[in-house]
């Protein structure tokens, strides 16, 4: 429901919830996406312990709906001919301006892992790879690098020199 209300498809997971399962109030929560691949990760851990058809079927919809949101959240950057994450995006560090933050390292790496893992789930279920997810995977921005170091975010070239980010 949250994803649909925000103009995306699939399932968007909150950063934190109340004991009843409702999304907890947060000034940054709606802008965070680092937690999105978690359900795919958890399902994959269960699959590694119980690599059978029943496990694949049990978590099929969670994996699919999570990946569906992830693919719909990535936006096409015409200038760079690639998919990007953000803006609006609050990185896991919660220190960068959400209205200018793009391609945070943790999120880009986890996005790639999550979508690829969801594609492998489809294959294990005897399904073809999802074309839209694959387009995002094939054209997702890489990790930003400066002076041989991965930046916190592509939009933060001063990741290691600006004292605000230390």
Where are the regions that the model predicts?
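Carbohydrate-binding/catalytic loop surfaces
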Residues: 3-28, 81-106, 149-165
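Helix-terminus loop motifs that line ligand-binding clefts
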Residues: 1-41, 47-58, 62, 66, ...
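Active-site core of glycosidic bond-cleaving carbohydrate-active enzymes
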Residues: 1, 32-41, 45-49, 57, ...
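Acidic/histidine-rich catalytic neighborhood
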Residues: 65, 69-124
């Amino acid at each position: 429901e949250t994803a649909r209300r925000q103009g995306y498809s699939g399932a968007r997971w909150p950063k934190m919830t109340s004991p009843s399962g409702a999304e907890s109030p947060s000034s940054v929560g709606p802008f965070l996406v680092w937690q999105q691949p978690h359900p795919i990760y958890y399902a994959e851990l269960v699959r590694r312990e119980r690599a059978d058809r029943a496990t694949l079927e049990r978590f099929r919809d969670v994996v699919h709906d999570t990946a569906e949101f992830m693919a719909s959240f990535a936006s096409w950057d015409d200038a760079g001919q690639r998919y990007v994450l953000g803006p609006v995006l609050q990185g896991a560090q919660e220190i960068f301006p959400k209205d200018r933050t793009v391609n945070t390292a943790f999120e880009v790496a986890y996005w790639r892992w999550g979508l690829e893992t969801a594609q492998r789930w489809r294959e294990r279920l005897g399904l073809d790879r999802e074309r839209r997810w694959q387009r995002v995977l094939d054209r997702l921005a890489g990790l930003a690098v400066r002076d041989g170091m991965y930046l916190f975010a592509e939009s933060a070239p001063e990741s290691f020199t600006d004292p605000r980010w230390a």
